[in-house]
């Protein structure tokens, strides 16, 4: 895990396996099926990193040999909230890691001015819960900011929110940091820039279209 001095709340997971799989996702000739599988695999691998600091307590269990106080995650419950639609492709990878997590959904689409338009919010109970928001791309940053806004408006503490993405543009990370400097943003790659159409360069194209095999 490394950081960029420009963005104090940004954490980049530079594990070789993650970078290898991300390269294959970037390839324009990668099939929809393979793209989908790689997205799930990368998200699972990133999940190990982003859950590294979950609070731990002990539980008394009986092994076949003895009783022992063994570590378990303390108190707080997990919720996975994909930002629709591309975020759906990441939720399965996180559920592979934490199958007991609750799942919510935040639906937004990008208007002509690139601002997010909300069309759906479905969340589990909020009390004493850690939320992992997921979306493959942080391009302009507006959708990511909006997703965090949804939780903060419902009084979810910033310390209980994490946002995980595959690739991000510096412009979007700056927007996210300006709006939510108290929320950690985890990515696999900080790419070069946004082009005139607000696509991340080099990026991996439209993650939703590549995930579902549709055309914009």
From Swiss-Prot:
Its EC number is 2.4.2.9. 5-phospho-alpha-D-ribose 1-diphosphate binds at residues 85, 110, 135-143, 206. Binds 1 Mg(2+) ion per subunit. The magnesium is bound as Mg-PRPP. Disulfide bonds: none annotated. Pathway: Pyrimidine metabolism; UMP biosynthesis via salvage pathway; UMP from uracil: step 1/1. Uracil binds at residues 200, 205-207. Keywords: Allosteric enzyme, Glycosyltransferase, GTP-binding, Magnesium, Nucleotide-binding, Transferase. Its cofactor is Mg(2+). It catalyses: UMP + diphosphate = 5-phospho-alpha-D-ribose 1-diphosphate + uracil. Allosterically activated by GTP. InterPro entries: PRibTrfase_dom, PRTase-like, Upp_B, UPRTase/APRTase, Ura_phspho_trans. Coiled coil: none annotated. It is an enzyme of class 2 (transferase). One of its GO terms (molecular function) is GTP binding. GO terms for biological process: UMP salvage; uracil salvage. Belongs to the UPRTase family. Catalyzes the conversion of uracil and 5-phospho-alpha-D-ribose 1-diphosphate (PRPP) to UMP and diphosphate. This is Uracil phosphoribosyltransferase.
């Amino acid at each position: 895990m490394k950081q960029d001095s420009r963005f104090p709340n940004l954490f980049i997971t530079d594990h070789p396996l993650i970078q290898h799989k991300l390269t294959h996702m970037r390839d324009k000739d990668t099939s929809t099926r393979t793209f989908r599988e790689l997205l799930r695999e990368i998200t699972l691998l990133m999940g190990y990193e982003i859950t590294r600091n979950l609070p731990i307590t002990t539980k008394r269990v009986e092994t076949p040999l003895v009783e022992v106080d063994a570590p378990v995650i303390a108190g707080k419950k997990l919720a996975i909230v994909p930002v629709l639609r591309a975020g759906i492709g990441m939720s399965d990878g996180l559920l592979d890691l934490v199958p007991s997590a609750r799942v919510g959904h935040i639906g937004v689409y990008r208007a002509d001015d690139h601002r997010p338009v909300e069309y759906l919010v479905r969340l589990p109970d909020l009390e004493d819960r850690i939320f992992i928001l997921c979306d493959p791309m942080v391009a302009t940053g507006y959708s990511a900011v909006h997703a965090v806004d949804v939780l903060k408006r419902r009084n979810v503490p910033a310390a209980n929110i994490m946002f995980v993405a595959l690739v991000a543009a510096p412009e979007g990370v700056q927007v996210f940091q300006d709006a939510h400097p108290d929320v950690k943003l985890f990515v696999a790659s900080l790419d070069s820039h946004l082009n005139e159409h607000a696509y991340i360069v080099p990026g991996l194209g439209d993650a939703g279209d590549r995930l579902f095999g549709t055309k914009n």
